[in-house]
Amino acid sequence: MAMDERRGKERVQWTTTIIISSSLKSYEIATALENRSHKVRYSDTLESGSIVFSLSGVAFLLMDAKECMTSAEEIFVTKIEKFINIHQNSFLVLFAPLHGPEEWSLMFRIHQRFLGSNLRILPVHNTVNALDLMCTIAKTTSKPHIDSICYRMITTKAYIIEQSPVWRTLQKIKLSSDSVSADSGE
């Protein structure tokens, strides 16, 4: 396959089915996902503020940092807890125009509270930032793309092992140290 053909294939827009909480129906993020040609479905049963990329198996909970800081901690902690208990591959998308000391403190408290869980925190500044991150994560974890990424990594590793002068030098050093340790063991 020629390089130009591969580039052309990479430019093809990725689309998938996305389930969005009905609470986000009037928000900019829902419209933006629809504008990217994704198949958007709304659900009343999904946790408020949630977006699920069903084919990728990833779920995102959108929360505003200011709202979290002004509400009682147990309210948003309970919401996050419920979310991660339902979704195995979960991300908290924390919106703040600027991530200052208060926002980082909030993220630290959330991180400490959910340490060891399947929750990852994504600090974002705006809708475009959030969309790019969510779509990148969902795309790279979807079946055809994850297989392609794994194949590329295996191919790259094999190339490095076969072609790298550094790797060859390391192998020679290891071989010479193996022969030294074999000689000293006699």
UniProtKB/Swiss-Prot annotation:
Tissue spec. comment: Testis (at protein level).
Main localization of the protein described in the UniProt heading: nucleus
Knocked-out gene: effects: Mice show a massive germline loss and infertility in both males and females. Defects in meiotic prophase progression and meiotic recombination seen in spermatocytes and oocytes. Meiocytes fail to achieve complete synapsis and show repair of double-strand breaks without formation of crossovers.
PANTHER family according to UniProt: HYPOTHETICAL PROTEIN LOC689986, PROTEIN SPO16 HOMOLOG
Record key words, sorted: Chromosome, Meiosis
Keyword Electron transport (UniProt): no
Paired cysteines (S-S): none
Any Pfam family hit: SCRE
Compartments where located: Chromosome
GO annotation (BP), single: reciprocal meiotic recombination
Function field: Plays a key role in reinforcing the integrity of the central element of the synaptonemal complex (SC) thereby stabilizing SC, ensuring progression of meiotic prophase I in male and female germ cells. Promotes homologous recombination and crossing-over in meiotic prophase I via its association with SHOC1. Required for the localization of TEX11 and MSH4 to recombination intermediates.
Record has Transmembrane as a keyword: no
Source organism of the structure: Mus musculus
InterPro entries: SCRE
Gene giving rise to this polypeptide: Spo16
GO cellular component, one term: chromosome
Name assigned to this protein: Protein SPO16 homolog
Oligomer and partners: Homooligomer. Interacts with SHOC1. Interacts with SYCP1 and SYCE3.
